[in-house]
């Protein structure tokens, strides 16, 4: 079961028992949500149909909702223009073209998305393996070095990469906390992530810069890292391997922007981003085999509390997806 099924009815527990609830199937579980999934076609569509027994009789529901699965935002955009989709995210190029042309028929349909419950982070792999499953000693030694990691923190400017998500207001994507902005507020009205900024000793978000960047500290830690790691047998540049879906041009374009950002920020003498691809399953082909140097991943809490985010980073149980899959 999942959070959409809570709170659980006591009458259901009385009827099928605790063990029966743990083993419940769609045929015997009690459910009173707005929609039921009436059709699911793998890698194609899922259809949600209005539940006539939904408890909120005043709610205005669609008769059905069809969610289409597509391989890229470019494909989705084409489906939108032909009327097959009702809304779509735009690639950087499509957004820029439409936004800068007020006569474009889609210009007045542009809406800036509200922030979701997700927060994205870089997750370093400290036990990277090569394709033959031997240990990637060069990367593992480098990423274990604190000065090397601080170079990423103080040096990596992601402004150009943020434009891939929001070309108009790219720094709205910037966040130094595990939680999304606007998730929770303190009793005095302080927004939680602004408190995190304060505790980190960083200035408040200004919407125009990445507040953690510090060129002087970056150069200091780069020199320190290269000295310490050279002594430890690491060869430079250190290659960081990053995976995207094969055949996805949008993902490749974004990865190339990230590669250039790494080059501009670190210098090709220090760190080089290598772009690789997987065929169908990022987890099975990459994460389970520990082939990635890092992953860019997001967590969205099932309830609005920072603990639910932080548990993914610090909990060593099987329920901590990040720790288990990306750790």
Segments from the language model and where they lie:
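Short, well-ordered beta-strand elements
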Residues: 33-37, 46-47, 63-68, 236-247, ...
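Extracellular/periplasmic solute-recognition and catalytic clefts
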Residues: 38-49, 66-133, 165
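Append "and occasionally in soluble cytosolic enzymes with long acidic Gly/Pro-rich linkers
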Residues: 49-50, 142-264
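Short helices/loops that flank or line small-molecule/ion binding pockets
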Residues: 74-85, 96-103, 256-264, 280-293
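Ligand-binding "clamshell"
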Residues: 97-114, 305-323
């Amino acid at each position: 079961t999942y959070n959409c099924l809570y709170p659980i009815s006591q009458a259901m527990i009385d009827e099928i028992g605790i063990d029966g609830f743990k083993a419940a199937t769609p045929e015997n579980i009690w459910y009173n949500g707005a929609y039921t999934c009436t059709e699911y076609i793998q890698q194609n569509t899922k259809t949600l149909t209005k539940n006539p027994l939904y408890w909120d009789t005043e709610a205005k529901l669609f008769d059905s909702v069809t969610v289409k699965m597509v391989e890229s935002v470019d494909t989705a955009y084409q489906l939108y223009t032909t009327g097959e989709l009702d809304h779509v995210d735009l690639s950087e190029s499509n957004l820029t073209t439409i936004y800068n042309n007020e006569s474009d028929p889609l210009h007045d349909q542009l809406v800036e998305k509200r922030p979701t419950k997700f927060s994205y982070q870089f997750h370093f792999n400290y036990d990277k393996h090569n394709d033959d499953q031997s240990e990637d000693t060069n990367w593992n030694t480098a990423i274990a070095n604190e000065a090397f990691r601080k170079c990423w923190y103080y040096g990596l400017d992601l402004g150009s990469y943020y434009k891939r998500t929001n070309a108009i207001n790219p720094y709205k994507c910037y966040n130094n906390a595990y939680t999304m902005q606007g998730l929770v507020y303190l009793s005095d009205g302080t927004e939680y992530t602004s408190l995190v900024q304060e505790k980190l000793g960083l200035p408040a978000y200004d919407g125009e810069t990445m507040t953690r960047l510090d060129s002087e500290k970056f150069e200091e830690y780069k020199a320190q890292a290269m000295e310490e790691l050279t002594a430890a047998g690491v060869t430079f540049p250190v290659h960081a391997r990053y995976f995207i879906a094969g055949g996805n041009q949008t993902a490749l374009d974004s990865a190339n922007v990230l590669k250039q950002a790494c080059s501009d920020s670190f210098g090709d003498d220090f760190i080089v981003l290598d772009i690789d691809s997987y065929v169908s399953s990022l987890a099975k082909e990459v994460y389970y085999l520990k082939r990635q140097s890092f992953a860019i991943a997001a967590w969205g809490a099932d309830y609005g509390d920072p603990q639910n985010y932080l548990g993914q980073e610090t909990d060593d149980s099987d329920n901590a997806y990040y720790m288990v899959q990306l750790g």
